[in-house]
Design a protein with these regions (language model features):
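N-terminal cap/leader regions of alpha/beta-hydrolase-fold enzymes
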Residues: 1-212
């Protein structure tokens, strides 16, 4: 069946070698502008469905807009190479792997991805952006704490006000100490982000002088 998200020939798989004990290789998808040097690098973080055709299409669109876009897997420790669809079984499988992540492991992988992108493209401006969706949006908020990440965009990142991957204080509580810029986009009818969570996110962003 033809994919609803066709991929122009501007992307390729890029595997980053681990640099910490227990860290797996990261099989990322790199999309580059076809006609000019990239203006900046962006990490693209998936929902619970892995680096699938849709996420690769997001990287492609960013590349066509002039960016070096690196789609980064979030479940490399439990499901390397995961690509899921969107049926109920896929949701169950994706949630299974999500519950086995930790903030420390995710941040280590994102730091590796940011540094790997800089090494692959040494002429890029210093620092990267980060964009993530749903669970990837939650992780994009975490990524704002990394020195390599200049700006993050969290699209409907659920659970930031009440939890943190692997346990610990809610991710939102660390926002004030994060050096990177952050934009959060929440849907008014998103059942996974109730109004009280949206209010908490808005208050934290305002207190930290961030966007919302």
């Amino acid at each position: 069946m033809t994919s609803p998200w066709p991929e122009p020939e501007i992307g390729r798989w890029l595997t980053l070698a681990p640099r910490e004990p227990g860290q797996p290789p990261l099989a990322c998808w790199l999309a580059l502008p076809p006609q000019a040097p990239p203006r900046a690098g962006i990490l693209v973080l998936p929902e619970i469905f892995g680096v699938n055709a849709w996420l690769r299409s997001v990287a492609t669109r960013l590349a066509l807009a002039g960016y070096a876009a690196l789609a980064v897997p979030l479940f490399s420790r439990t499901a390397p190479g995961l690509e899921l669809g969107y049926d109920d079984a896929a949701v169950r499988e994706g949630r299974f792997h999500k519950e086995r992540t930790s903030a420390a492991d995710l941040l280590a992988d994102l730091a590796l991805a940011a540094d790997g992108l800089a090494q692959a493209l040494p002429d890029l401006p210093a620092g990267v952006g980060c964009v993530g969706f749903c669970f990837g949006g939650h992780v994009a908020m975490l990524a704002a704490s990394l020195p390599q990440v200049r700006a993050s965009c969290d699209f409907y990142g659920a659970g930031v006000a009440t939890g943190r991957p692997g346990g610990g204080p809610p991710t939102l509580e660390g926002l004030a100490a994060s050096p990177g810029r952050l934009l959060c986009v929440c849907g008014s009818e998103d059942a996974l982000i109730p109004p009280e969570d949206v209010a908490a996110i808005a208050a934290a962003l305002q207190a930290a002088n961030r966007d919302r």
